[in-house]
């Protein structure tokens, strides 16, 4: 089955294995295991030629690459690197990190088929202040559209409904025609992620 979306933008609610880190995420939103994420029928949403833009933290990179394959895409590159500034000061934000004090997050780019980029002048860096916990810069959507063109697009795990985007997530009214409920009610429990 081929879907209609040529652009899929996702910020998965990663579940961390470290209890200290996991608690921080769980205080703000429900998280999902890698198997729960892999069970989502995202591959069915993707057009024959489509691009996936997916946020991942550095500790989650191995799981992010597994998820890309499970959703039917092939990893290509890091589309964007978000360098975080503090909200109220012109200085860099630093999280606790695992080995070093963390700052950046990456948005991975993966493809299915042969999507065409529409612009060659889109810069990888996004320098933007942090906002609500885990909220990504709105500028990312603009960069995606500039890079890929005004194509049918959906944002998964969305927190808002931006113009021109279909959305799905537990913080928005879904417009993507995916599932009527949050994944814990609609995922397939017998699916495991590819290694």
Residue ranges and their predicted role:
Residues 1-195:
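Class I S-adenosyl-L-methionine-dependent methyltransferase catalytic core
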